[in-house]
Swiss-Prot record:
Heterodimer of HisH and HisF. Its main location: cytoplasm. It comes from the Bacteria. This is Imidazole glycerol phosphate synthase subunit HisH. It comes from Oleidesulfovibrio alaskensis (strain ATCC BAA-1058 / DSM 17464 / G20). One of its GO terms (biological process) is L-histidine biosynthetic process. It is found in: Cytoplasm. IGPS catalyzes the conversion of PRFAR and glutamine to IGP, AICAR and glutamate. The HisH subunit catalyzes the hydrolysis of glutamine to glutamate and ammonia as part of the synthesis of IGP and AICAR. The resulting ammonia molecule is channeled to the active site of HisF. The lineage of its organism: Bacteria, Pseudomonadati, Thermodesulfobacteriota, Desulfovibrionia, Desulfovibrionales. Keywords: Amino-acid biosynthesis, Cytoplasm, Glutamine amidotransferase, Histidine biosynthesis, Hydrolase, Lyase. InterPro entries: Class_I_gatase-like, GATASE, Imidazole-glycPsynth_HisH. One of its GO terms (molecular function) is glutaminase activity.
Length: 213
C-alpha cells in the first residue's frame, strides 16, 4: 500500500487515478499511523512553495515526513513536492523541508531555447529526462522517453544528489535524491506510459524494501 500525502497543496486525485490504473493499492491520507504503516509515500504538490509549506506545517505533516524519511521509508516527491524537499526555494523566499541539500531557483526568462528564441516561463510541455547515474525509478524506461513538466522554478541540489537532468534554456536537475528518496520535477501521473512505469518501479522498490525488513 502506498500513502499519497493529503494536504491542500497537493494534486492527490490525479496521482491516485494513475496508481489505480496500474493496480497499485493506495490511500490518500494525512493520518500519521496510516503513513507509517504504508510501504512508501508519494508527496505530490501544485501551486507555490510558500503555500505548500504553510499547509504542510499547519497539518503537522512536515514533521511526519522527516520522521518517516529518517526511519527509512521510501519517498517520492512530485513537482512542488520535489522542490520543497530541498532546503530553500526562491519562490516566496521560503525555507523548505531540508530533506535533501540544495535550493530551488526561478528560470531566467532571458535564456534561449534551441532555436534561439527566449524560453517561456513557466516551462510547460514534454521533455526528455536523461539519467546521470543508475536509478531504480528508470528501470525499463527508454533514454528517449519524455515526461510532462509544468513549473517556473527548478531544483538545484548539491551535485551528489543529481540523478537526472533536462534541458530547457539550460541543463537543470529534473530528478534528485538517492536510493529510496527521490524527487521528480515532472508529473509522472500525467506522462503516459513512461510515467506509469516510473510509478510502478517506485512501488516495486517499496515492496522489496518492506519485505527486506
Amino acid at each position: 500500500m502506498l500513502a499519497i500525502l493529503k494536504y491542500k497543496a497537493g494534486n492527490q486525485t490525479s496521482v491516485r487515478r494513475a496508481l489505480n490504473h496500474i493496480g497499485i493499492p493506495n490511500v490518500i491520507t494525512a493520518d500519521p499511523a496510516e503513513i507509517a504503516a504504508s510501504e512508501g509515500i508519494i508527496f505530490p504538490g501544485v501551486g507555490a512553495a510558500g503555500q505548500a509549506m504553510d499547509e504542510l506545517t499547519a497539518a503537522g505533516l512536515d514533521a511526519v515526513l522527516k520522521e518517516q524519511v529518517e526511519a527509512g521509508k521510501p519517498l517520492l516527491g512530485i513537482c512542488v513536492g520535489c522542490q520543497i524537499m530541498l532546503d530553500y526555494s526562491q519562490e516566496n523566499d521560503t525555507r523548505t523541508l531540508g530533506i535533501i541539500p540544495g535550493e530551488c531557483h526561478l528560470f531566467n526568462p532571458a535564456l534561449e531555447d534551441e532555436t534561439g528564441a527566449p524560453i517561456r516561463v513557466p516551462h510547460m510541455g514534454w521533455n526528455r529526462v536523461i539519467p546521470r547515474k543508475p536509478c531504480a525509478l528508470f528501470k525499463g524506461i527508454s533514454d528517449d522517453a519524455e515526461f510532462y513538466f509544468v513549473h517556473s522554478y527548478f531544483p538545484n541540489p548539491q551535485p551528489d544528489y543529481v540523478i537526472a537532468t533536462t534541458t530547457y534554456g539550460k541543463e537543470f536537475c529534473s530528478v534528485h535524491g538517492g536510493p529510496g528518496l527521490w524527487a521528480v520535477q515532472f508529473h509522472p501521473e500525467k506522462s503516459g506510459r513512461p510515467g506509469l512505469k516510473l510509478l510502478s518501479n517506485f512501488h516495486a522498490y517499496c515492496k522489496e524494501a518492506a519485505n527486506a525488513q
